[in-house]
Amino acid sequence: MSALTRLILVVSLVAVTTAPAAHAAERMWMGFHDDPVLRWDAGRIDELDAAAQTNATIVRTFVTWANAAPRRPANPSNPFDPAYMLDDVDELVRNAQNRGMEVLITIWGTPRWANGGRTPNYVPTNMTELRRFAQALSARYSGRYPGYPFVRFYGIWNESNLARFLAPQFDARGEIVAPRNYAKLAAAAYAGIKAGSPRSLVAIGETSSHGRDKQVPKLSDSTSPGTFARLLAEANPRLQFDAYAHHPYPYPVFFKPTQLVRWPNVSLKSLPRLERSLSTWFRRDNIPIWITEYGHETKPGEPLGVTEAQQADYLPQAVALAKRDRRVEMFVWFVFRDSLGSSWQSGLYRRNGTRKPALARWASTAPPVDARNPSLSARGGQRAPDVNLTTREICATNGEGTAVGMTYRARLAGKLVKVGQIQTRLRSDCSITVRPAFTVAPGKRYVIQFDLNTENGVSLRRTVTIAGSGRG
């Protein structure tokens, strides 16, 4: 290893390239969405430290196009056009990377100059404008520019089955039109994101857990998530996406995570039905699911909410439901701390900064499913399987091409079976490929500890589990 010092790798999105993961939901990205606290609060650095200490591995954030580009850029595809106002996003992405966390950016909200002077929930009059913005944003965080970390995950719009975020939901005859409009919006945003950052992963949907499918006087228009997804697939069955995102909140807010709701509304318990339906409608098997918002609001801030003790009981139940579903790859809790900047009371901290009982449950629930310590499968009898690892903290102080060295130790049933050393190079998306030199026996399960290092002293540790397929 020459001058390379000891380092343990932050493993994100690890995959054996020769065989798919056998039980993807054994690991999930778990984290928080709380822009008022984690992005804008004066104490945001301390808040992010606290989130990292709870074993959070991802932070979700909104990039509201209307705020990022209040006036039309001279060159909309340029990630650094002077019209773009993204300093706070830059800071969050850097701060998250420094703490080993991934970022999910959800793009939504049309500027007035792009939709005829309407509010942000109306689609652009020309989808090319959205495509160019999405391309500029993803290129900015493509890992190609020093000081602007790679962002791996993107979502397109927010709760598009609600008029609050996407209007209109119905036409003058009362027919549902939002899915058809969203199909165009999603296609444009997906194309832009992939043009700017081909290695990024993009989710569509981002649907709310419930809707009415008909107009009701004095109530905001909404479409149920099941109906929305079905009509979306009808509008464009070949729509491209890497995952489908959903917000399976309990509704009403006092429901348990295990509560079934009437289809086509979709709760945590009914996610499998949505998944089967998505496979049928889009004619695609095993569509990954991202839970990009979930939470339980507590009393007294939410009079109809649950007690803090109930929230603490429900949190691990919700995670367990998600974990049992092999398609679920992400679980984001909304919010981290109750605050004046949010109307939600679902935080794991109270407004005064004291802990709710649910915080301890999160801190104990998150580590076993940490996606940085992945669980994979490889073909039985295969030697030196390729393993792709992301090394997020290394990127905080090192650029593309940096030499990354490591010592690995493979164990079978606790017995050391292989010790080896590898040196490889860092890619722009904060990933490396390693080939631990041992043969994966059929039916055996190996635990491999990686201790990675760089010349500038970065040191991390992650553990990878590899199961050999076939019978031993």
Language-model-detected regions and their locations in the chain:
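Substrate-binding cleft and catalytic face of glycoside hydrolase catalytic domains
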Residues: 54-217, 249-251, 299
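Enriched for extracellular/lumenal, surface-exposed ectodomains of secreted and cell-surface proteins
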Residues: 448-458
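Bacterial N-terminal signal peptides
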Residues: 7-17
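Aromatic-rich peripheral "rim/lid" segments of glycoside hydrolase catalytic domains that contact
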Residues: 143, 160, 165, 173, ...
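Boundary/entry segment of secreted carbohydrate-active catalytic domains
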Residues: 24-58, 62-64
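Edge beta-strands of extracellular beta-sandwich domains
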Residues: 458-468
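Noncatalytic carbohydrate-binding groove/subsite architecture in carbohydrate-active enzymes
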Residues: 41-45, 131-145, 150-152, 173-309
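Solvent-exposed serine/threonine-rich low-complexity stretches and specific carbohydrate-binding patches
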Residues: 417-429, 465-466
